[in-house]
């Protein structure tokens, strides 16, 4: 252990010294690499994805059409090519990062021969089943991308909130979630050297790199990786100091009111600081990992001073280009207006004040000032709509009862429990009656189970008319065929498609709105929806940082478990909008103010 600690301290000092000595050339070169990966690399991937979607005859891939997509041999082949290109770009990016570290001030040898050799080594590394090992490694790193050395192409990838959110709603789910997180964390630590090994030891197959990384982190050696935390603290301290300087200058120049150009410059400054910080972190961590297995690559000779000056001028020009693009983007962002009259929809009522989809939860949602309250309904065996998210009632009742296989009289009134609250299962009619009494409208989500009769959609339309809410309530479903048929049967119903994950464009223009999960939302999709006369809702937005972020987008509605929080944060943002608050929102650090 003592030997590991001494080696760790020695390597940390060496990394910091190297970073300080070559900081300008490092930041400039990696900035260009990051820029090329997120423009040309991302464009190639987007273009190939478009080819995949065109050949599958669908505008976008969702959970509705996933099966037909995967059973098409042509799209499967193109999808394999897409994954292969993604793997190659990641491999190439890390190869170039290693080259930058090794060259330092020397000329980068990245000509045609370099790319030819890298391509040959890549295909050798992932040939056969080793490609599956590489994909397994990438999937394994997803929960920890923001904490590890990750590709620029994967930095915005994370586990969708609807997956983790559902697991965290029950005790067993929490055990599973945190248990899996701990297991994934352990495997990430054990495989931390895999990618650096794969790009430096050119004859290695990827599975061999995984095995070697496992060996390098055995026993007390795993603590060497954790020792990098001290370097992270230093980088965070520098970023904090620069950020504080920017906040102070912006507040001094602009006073209490934000003007357009100062806001634009401030956004650009924040982006630049965070961008540089990420690059330095990536470079420092990779450099530290390389020292862990000592590839013994000789340092290349430095270039002559006059050539160094020419190269620095060229690199500075390219960096100014990147900064100009960033400034243009932030000019657009500063001039864009956030969504006005944002609708707040209580997700299954208000979970913090009652059992989901219960009358008490509905009442709490109404008192919180929600515009709508969302609920889920499932058809019983005898044709009655029951308010429930799950077909199987075990999660809330403890009883292994399936709604779609049961008579309504046998399940209505069953006691349901969640988070210390108790209630009972109710019918759609009783829920609507309570909503009318409270003066709140509903967003009804249809949950077909596959056991419904052929006239399922007609039964629902008739029920909406019977309750006189067919034109005032919103209706949505994750089953696109179901919601499109409902719209066809009654055009007065405001219909929407529930989208849990999506690649590409929207798959239907027959609905009135799209309810899209946070993971798949982006401003480009929102603009397309609005151009086509559709509204876009985003779910399920619960954290303060996410709420603040979406309050400044063009989304039409936020679906949340905490409607009270959304209304409170709306008021706070309107009352307190200093540059410090602005910075904390941009960096997802608003929670600091609540400490």
Where are these regions (language model features)?
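Structural preference for beta-strand elements that scaffold enzyme active sites
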Residues: 341-345, 372, 439-443, 472-474, ...
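Membrane-interface segments at or immediately adjacent to transmembrane helices
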Residues: 331-382, 386-387, 394-396, 401-405, ...
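C-terminal active-site rim and adjoining tail of enzyme catalytic domains
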Residues: 226, 497-499, 504-595
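Hydrophobic alpha-helical membrane segments
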Residues: 1-344
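Conserved, mostly hydrophobic/aromatic
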Residues: 347, 365, 376, 411, ...
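Loop/turn elements at helix/coil->beta-strand transitions in domains of secreted/extracellular proteins
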Residues: 124-125, 222-225, 437-441, 469-472, ...
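A cross-domain feature marking catalytic cores of carbohydrate-active enzymes
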Residues: 348, 375-377, 446, 477, ...
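Metal-dependent phosphodiesterase/phospholipase catalytic core, i.e.
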Residues: 389-493, 586-594
